[in-house]
């Protein structure tokens, strides 16, 4: 649909920590500040999918899964809802 966005993919197998490196945090925040649509998509230990805004990368790195996601979906996954979340502003 002509909308560019970037997604950092992560998997958490146990615990609450989302393994974002400092370079990834910096890139996501900087890109977001310059108008880029950036997201962090995480599969949780219980197979849910959490979506965070890239601008929140520092909080995601610090708080991990304790931070409330902008979107949480369970199986069976609603892929259309996820797609819409990438192309619209998620607050």
Regions found by a protein language model. Name each.
Residues 1-14:
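Conserved catalytic cores of phosphodiester-cleaving nucleases, focusing on short active-site segments
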Residues 5, 50-52, 77:
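Sequence-level detector for tyrosine residue identity
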Residues 12-31:
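Mg2+/Mn2+-dependent nuclease catalytic core
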Residues 22, 47, 72-74:
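Alpha-helical structural elements
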Residues 29-58:
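Nucleic-acid nuclease catalytic cores
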Residues 55-91:
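Helix-rich interaction surfaces within compact, conserved domain-sized segments
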